[in-house]
Curated annotation (Swiss-Prot):
More info: Bacitracin is thought to be involved in the inhibition of peptidoglycan synthesis by sequestering undecaprenyl diphosphate, thereby reducing the pool of lipid carrier available.
UniProt topology in membrane: Multi-pass membrane protein
Name recorded for this polypeptide: Undecaprenyl-diphosphatase
Organism from which the protein derives: Pectobacterium carotovorum subsp. carotovorum (strain PC1)
Keyword Hydrolase found: yes
Catalytic reaction annotation: di-trans,octa-cis-undecaprenyl diphosphate + H2O = di-trans,octa-cis-undecaprenyl phosphate + phosphate + H(+)
NCBIfam families: PRK00281.1-1 (NF001388), PRK00281.1-2 (NF001389), PRK00281.1-4 (NF001390), undec_PP_bacA (TIGR00753)
TM ranges: 6-26, 45-65, 92-112, 115-135, 189-209, 225-245, 251-271
Length: 272
């Protein structure tokens, strides 16, 4: 593989990762499809995916840095209150939402990694699509938590339980958490913001664990390729998050569900 070819692959996968990581469409499903299409499916490819996820995480940190630092008691000016109640999103909300998936993820880490096959991803895309539809059709007519600061500890924990579904490769972490949030009475916009903020510790923890287990596949010659993928994923994710938060006020998740079904069909035709 030539250096130019490697950098092109890194750029393409960085775009795919950045576009899909925080949308309810499954970044894993897209990475598997595009990775197979590019012929980039070895152990180095898995390590590469872990590293470019850090670029996507950094995009969330840049978007919500005041809120994130505020959660740990470091304040850079006043964070605007989002909601109709006197509540405030606290670190305890995030910790409660993390517990279910962290416990299951640690216990079944090796089992989960063994599920990274197109057939499993295809099923997850379909089931996750139906969950998005269920969230739109069954959500309360009037959300109890309109803004991010209205979310209760109980709602945060329930969102965390839904997040466990994302341990199934191809399900979509954002799809599971946003759908779960809507079903327990959180507005679509607030559930999306909470999902993005929750992604930082969840993805960071999973990424560090994966990186620890696969660091021996790294070499200095891979640095340019990984750097291109990281930077590309960061920039594209930043644009994707900003755009998503704008359009989600005006559209439902039905188009995303339909898109998931289409991607599942592509997986079936290509890999089955």
């Amino acid at each position: 593989m030539t250096d130019l070819h490697s950098l092109l692959i890194a750029f393409i996968l960085g775009v795919v990762e950045g576009l899909t990581e925080f949308l309810p469409v499954s970044s894993t499903g897209h990475m598997i499809i595009v990775g197979h299409w590019l012929g980039f499916v070895d152990e180095k490819a898995k390590t590469f995916e872990v590293i470019i996820q850090l670029g996507s995480i950094l995009a969330v940190v840049v978007m919500f840095w005041r809120r994130l630092f505020g959660l740990i008691g470091i304040h850079f000016g006043e964070v605007p209150h989002e909601g109709h109640t006197a509540g405030r999103l606290k670190l305890t909300h995030i910790l409660l939402a993390m517990i279910p998936a962290v416990v299951l993820g640690l216990v079944f880490h090796d089992v989960i990694k063994s599920l990274f096959y197109p057939q499993n991803v295809m099923y997850a895309l379909v089931v996750g699509g139906f969950l998005l539809l269920a969230a739109e059709w069954l959500k309360p007519k009037k959300p109890r938590a309109v803004g991010l600061d209205d979310i209760t500890h109980r709602q945060a924990f329930m969102i965390g339980c839904f997040q466990c579904l994302a341990l199934w490769p191809g399900f979509s972490r954002s799809g599971a958490t946003i759908s779960g949030g809507m079903l327990v009475g959180v507005s679509r916009y607030a559930a999306s913001e909470f999902s993005f903020i929750l992604a930082v510790p969840m993805m960071m923890g999973a990424t560090v664990l994966d990186l620890y287990k696969s660091w021996h596949f790294l070499s200095l010659s891979d640095v340019p390729m990984f750097a291109v993928g990281f930077v590309t994923a960061f920039l594209v994710a930043l644009i994707a998050i900003k755009t998503f938060l704008k359009i989600i006020k005006r559209i439902s998740f039905v188009p995303f569900a339909i898109y998931r079904f289409i991607v599942a069909g592509v997986v079936y035709m290509v890999f089955m």
